[in-house]
């Protein structure tokens, strides 16, 4: 369950950012965290949310809502030059939709980024 390590990383990154803020003592809670997740990370978002609940216990991130934008990988065919989004078939075979070649360069789809977070303060 690699979702727990991702959840722990989210909490650690947010808490480190808050600690380094000039007015860190005014932050009362984190209400929402927006993520960018590449589809090739194979993260199960429901499991990530559950792991986040566990990892955020006792921190300002407790009860924060996680939202995610899922990013598709792209391919470039070394044979015909096709460029576009990666689509896999039921056999999990990845090939060029134009010429059927397996000689592809895959880019993107492995991202895992905190896009932003909404912090609540006294003010």
UniProtKB/Swiss-Prot annotation:
Keyword annotations from UniProtKB, A to Z: Metal-binding, Nickel, Zinc
NCBIfam families: hypA
InterPro entries, alphabetized: HypA/HybF
Binding site for Zn(2+): 77, 80, 96, 99
The keyword Zinc is annotated on this UniProt entry: yes
A single BP term in Gene Ontology: protein maturation
Protein species of origin: Methanococcus aeolicus (strain ATCC BAA-1280 / DSM 17508 / OCM 812 / Nankai-3)
Protein name per its UniProtKB record: Hydrogenase maturation factor HypA
Protein family: Belongs to the HypA/HybF family.
Metal-binding as UniProt keyword: yes
Binding site for Ni(2+): 2
GO molecular function, one term: nickel cation binding
Name of the gene: hypA
Pfam families, A to Z: HypA
